[in-house]
Amino acid sequence: MRLKAFFKKVSGCIPFSDCRNVVFGFFSQTPFFVLKTGKNPQWNKSQCCVNIEENCYCLLVTQNRRKDGCLMGIYLNPGNNKFKRAVNSDIYVDKTGLIKYTNSIVDTLQSCVCVSRPRRFGKSMAADMLTAYYSKGCDSRELFSGLEIAKDESFEEHLNKYDTIFLNMQEFLSRSSNVKELLERVEGKVIRELKKQYPDVELYDENDLAETMQDIFAESECLFIVIIDEWDCIFREFKHDKAAQEIYLDFLRDLLKDKEYIYLAYMTGILPIKKYGTHSALNMFDEFSMIDPGPLAEYVGFTEKEVEALCQKYQMDINEIKNWYDGYSFEEVESVYSPKSVVSCMRLGKLGNYWNQTETFEALQIYIDMNFEGLRDDILSMIAGETVPVNTRSFTNDMTTFRTEDDVLTLLIHLGYLGYRYADKTVFIPNEEIRSEYVSAIAVSDWGEVSKALKNSADTLQAIWQGREEQVAEGIRQAHFETSHLQYNDENALSYTISLALYAARNFYTVHRELSGGKGFADIVYVPRKRFLDKPALVVELKWDKNAEGAIQQIKEKEYCRSLEEYKGNLLLVGINYDKKTQVHTCKIEQYRKEESI
């Protein structure tokens, strides 16, 4: 309960028609009394005032109520301060359009929604926003004025109209030693505030939250909106405690499923709802995840248009930002950026890996080191820029049940370490920020020569710039890996090896596979980024069981450099061959001379 206290010099007749009791006392030999607000006076109803002597000081203590009599609580009808801080921040991207969707589903069969996203993708901000909009404990009209939702016809209809319960399960978990204690704390805290708001309602069981809400609804027809943040923290903290997980799911089912008093239920977390075979605890929820966010895709992260506006304001290169933080793609929205990383980049004015501020690479290492056939090879293929097919249907939405490589890859989608294309059911590493996380994880893992090659890739790139052909060949040899599904027997497989050997080149170049130019397609072309125009462009041609000199000759004959005319005079031709018999890589490097025709 929040209290307002103030001293007031009074005399005469003092009305207290909404007071529970009067407490008299003395302070420094001065009499005072305390007025406490409430609905049921404990005195004679005919008494409506108290006469006190002149110059008596009165300590008035009142609960923090809105003008309509609604209490503002911590869990029941919170205020809008958290969302106000977000709106007042240096960078705020308006995502209030989400409210238009939730307004469209209130009081329908689709009124239960579970939204899952990776860490730092704005889940809590969305929950705070919905709370600020629906809660009866605050007046948010001014806060939302000027934002997108204020233009919608549903804005006034639902603004601050409902008893809203907001629960951050991580907060309760941090103060609980087990799930049972957590649920007792949740019920106790919320019921206490419900009793203050509805003191006249007779409750059947004051320790049962669902029963309490049902009793209040039966007497007052009050509709509740329930917003749960970090709903899945139990599954991340108690990974192996299946019994505790089921108890938690059953609690949510009893609280939310088929209840007349639920007007809207909105849950958000990292993982989708846990599957327990035929146990359909929360099957009333519509789920929107990183696999298929549906109509909520534009609220997963920042869109292209939103990032372009930020780049213009903060004078950042959109292409660089795109390379580092873009890559999440959905049917409804083709380009989605990692919001926390974009905000950090804009505020600090420099590109970098901001992902590791939310989670260390060891979290990724645990999963890519798992012993599933094909997993390591697929990770390497994706680091090299390839996509990999995946079946997401067998994943049980927890962090311990892995039966196949597909289950591991699916978890990495939900954690944000992989992007997913719904159309062709493939996964990929979305951007350079995430790619660097994989390289960091591999560097401390037992991945043999691959780990060494990635660490030495900067030296291999430097060797190309300096024309040291034998050192380049040695760097490629280190990156040479055997796979089951990508046999090292053609130029395509060789290209994966080159991509790993030259991983460090991504810091300086935009990499193009099969780039059209002249009379055909160059195998790999490295185009310098705007910040590194002093670096030479690289045209790499690969040969299998032939010779490196022939690769250089093909670049010239087919005029692959024609599309790179602006780099004339600062262009290196790189030919690489793998001899099947000797199992030796050879390299030939030649500078494209200015006088040669492009």
What kind of region is each of these model predictions?
Residues 50-486:
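Phosphate-binding site recognition
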Residues 215-220, 506-533:
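Active-site metal-binding core of divalent-cation-utilizing nuclease and nuclease-like domains
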Residues 478-512:
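Acidic-basic catalytic patches of nuclease active cores, encompassing PD-(D/E)XK
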